[in-house]
């Protein structure tokens, strides 16, 4: 067997393994429908984009994701883990549920029950409306601010929309205020 052919036989399987691993990192969470991957359905396009990115972040750094919801949304870590691993909730749904609950001053279990009762076909906007929390309301604003804060905690880049830029400024402006 020539050296070139032998090299190709060794390199090709390695390349296929690496390509498979790269594709797996971008795969949706188990149990997530293809529709859910296209849009999280919060009623706010900016929030939807961030929630889908949170799915990617949580797939790569599940412990950091769970720490974030436990620490800043006061969701017990064991409960978040159960939603993620046993009930197969996508990270975006866990994040949205717990930070919406915190922003609207609702018990997190009430928001989780509302989501579960509505079923997988229901959007988060429908669930939030049923809880009397409409997109554009103050709790939604607090949710948007929480997303920015999470990205800052994770030291993850985020593109703010015009409203958030006016409210929060850029990262350099947010960092000194976060330290206080």
Segments (PLM) and residue ranges:
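A generic alpha-helix preference that emphasizes hydrophobic side chains
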Residues: 19-23, 91
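Conserved, charge-rich beta-strand/loop surface module that forms ligand/interface-binding patches
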Residues: 28-29, 41, 45
């Amino acid at each position: 067997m020539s050296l070139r052919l032998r090299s190709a036989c060794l390199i090709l399987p390695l390349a296929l393994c690496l390509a498979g691993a790269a594709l797996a990192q971008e795969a949706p969470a188990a149990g997530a429908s293809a529709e859910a991957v296209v849009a999280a359905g919060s009623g706010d396009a900016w929030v939807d984009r961030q929630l889908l990115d949170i799915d990617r972040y949580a797939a790569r750094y599940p412990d950091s994701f769970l720490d974030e919801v436990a620490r800043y949304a006061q969701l017990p870590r064991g409960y978040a883990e159960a939603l993620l691993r046993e009930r197969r909730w996508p990270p975006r749904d866990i994040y949205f549920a717990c930070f919406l609950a915190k922003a609207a001053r609702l018990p997190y279990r009430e928001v989780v029950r509302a989501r579960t009762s509505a079923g997988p076909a229901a959007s988060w906007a429908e669930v939030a409306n049923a809880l009397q929390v409409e997109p554009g309301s103050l709790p939604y604003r607090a949710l948007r601010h929480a997303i920015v804060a999470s990205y800052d905690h994770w030291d993850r880049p985020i593109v703010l929309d015009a409203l958030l830029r006016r409210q929060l400024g850029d990262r350099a402006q947010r960092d000194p205020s976060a330290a206080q």
